[in-house]
Amino acid sequence: MSDQKLSVNEYLKTDSNYLRGTIEEGLDTSLTGAFNDADQQLIKFHGFYQQDDRDLRNERKEQKLEPLYSFMLRARVAGGVCTPKQWLGVDKIASTLTSSNSIRLTTRQTFQYHGIPKRNLKTLIQDLDREALDSIAACGDVNRNVMCNPNPVESKLHQQAYYWAKKLSDNYLPRTKAYAEIWLGDDKVAVSESEEVEPVYGKTYLPRKFKMAVAVPPDNDVDVYTNDLGFIAVAEDGELVGFNMVAGGGMGSTHGEVATFPRLGDDFGFIKAEDCLKFAEAVLKVQRDWGNRSDRKQSRLKYTIVKHGFEAFKAEVEQRAGVKFEPKREVVIGDRGDRYGWIKGVDNNWHLTLFIEGGRIKDLPGQPLQTGLREIALVHKGDFRMTANQNIIIAGVAEEDKAQIEALARSHGLMGKLISPTRGHSIACVALPTCALAMAEAERYFPDFMTKVEALQEKHGFLEQPIVIRMTGCPNGCARPFAAEIGLVGKAPGRYNLYLGASFEGTRLNKLYRENIQEAEILAALDELFARYVKEREAGETFGNFTVRVGVVKAVIDAAKDFHG
């Protein structure tokens, strides 16, 4: 590949001195609340994005002011596990260093802050560091936060799976000292041209973002097939023996560009647990060397596999790993939702899953959620565990402490509200007003929209049955809308593309049903489909499977050919 073909980002990475760029100079500049264009790309590797308040954009323009710039910072928390002490630190940061005064749980089992002024960035990162937390590689062209079923004390198998998720996270962190130098005040280290700073990533890192997940069947809460690389735990007599490996998933696409599409990962076969890191590193290095560095819209692993072919990619991974895949083991992939309320673990401790609407932890009228979790953290002796459905688990509660934890949860509006199965299975991205890519609302609008969907379900007599519904403000797919039975993807203010037909378990994508429609049209379409579903469904048939069986949409078997066709 010639230099002329490289995307701008590749030059930026090459010239960045291993992600340093001119970030420090940008921090010292008080003339603007922003970083320059090049550093805006590099700061992603440090865990944050530059944003502005889009609700105020026109008003500030009229006042001849620059946009109200702020930053969204995402933490790296493998498997979503943190201690009560860490949670108190996370909470204090939200209350003192951000304008949103909130904590946002993400669809990848971590938390993020919105509304951070540039002047607060260094203090915030240093405060996180004091809690043994960081934001390294939470964004950027690297392996991002590794997901795992969030309750590793539910069984021995969960503990073993979490161990490997943590190893995957730690092993594939960038090795550059840029983060420590810029944010934590570590001594600067001169880097020679011959020095191998990044043994896995190299000087230009990966062509694009890379996402990993570890699933523990029958749960598929981590949506393992939507990841670049997924490991599905295989057990014998309750002990982890290895994983079925899947690779090539990814949700992002671009409206109107048929060369871009979401995709679910391919099944590659079974690997022994002790070979997990060999295969992970092999996949990363093949993607590093084979991935498209010219067109970032074609740079994800899914396009690399489609371009080179499954068999060629598999053979290269085996060659680099030095181990061959065994035939895939049979496992059952089931529910993607969280189990709300109390669950008892094998160690006789209890785990309380709390529903957090939109993942937004903030004190609301009659629901002081943030205060409630703070009060719980002050007395809780176990862990906090964030889920891929934007919820939180108070894990490791002793029998004698249950009543106190439940009383705190109920008195602060964290328990007691009846949640329908569909609402409990549904998620939305942040979108407006902070996300620069959003074309329509998601988080702010989704609760009211879900109330209207619930009314339709009640009208047709199946409110007790869950449907996986997801909404995003754009087609980048942060809330994994293309793997939802009903997916709504923002097209313009108040307008969405409506997708139908994904499987309930997350093993089949959905397909476009109606394009660029408003709420009234969406609800009318669902009203009609719900009526048909109740009359024509087969025993135990999920809504997504029904829409495919009766021909409302065609099944997506090969995304490269079927998703747009």
UniProtKB/Swiss-Prot annotation:
Its cofactor is siroheme; [4Fe-4S] cluster. It catalyses: hydrogen sulfide + 3 NADP(+) + 3 H2O = sulfite + 3 NADPH + 4 H(+). GO terms for biological process: cysteine biosynthetic process; hydrogen sulfide biosynthetic process; sulfate assimilation. PROSITE patterns: NIR_SIR. SUPFAM superfamilies: Nitrite and sulphite reductase 4Fe-4S domain-like, Nitrite/Sulfite reductase N-terminal domain-like. Siroheme binds at residue 478. Keywords: 4Fe-4S, Amino-acid biosynthesis, Cysteine biosynthesis, Heme, Iron, Iron-sulfur, Metal-binding, NADP, Oxidoreductase. Pfam families: NIR_SIR (PF01077), NIR_SIR_ferr (PF03460). Binds 1 siroheme per subunit. [4Fe-4S] cluster binds at residues 429, 435, 474, 478. It is an enzyme of class 1 (oxidoreductase). Signal peptide: none annotated. GO terms for cellular component: sulfite reductase complex (NADPH). Pathway: Sulfur metabolism; hydrogen sulfide biosynthesis; hydrogen sulfide from sulfite (NADPH route): step 1/1. Its EC number is 1.8.1.2. GO terms for molecular function: 4 iron, 4 sulfur cluster binding; heme binding; metal ion binding; NADP binding; sulfite reductase (ferredoxin) activity; sulfite reductase (NADPH) activity. Component of the sulfite reductase complex that catalyzes the 6-electron reduction of sulfite to sulfide. This is one of several activities required for the biosynthesis of L-cysteine from sulfate. HAMAP family: CysI (MF_01540). Belongs to the nitrite and sulfite reductase 4Fe-4S domain family. Alpha(8)-beta(8). The alpha component is a flavoprotein, the beta component is a hemoprotein. This is Sulfite reductase [NADPH] hemoprotein beta-component. It comes from Shewanella loihica (strain ATCC BAA-1088 / PV-4). The gene is cysI.
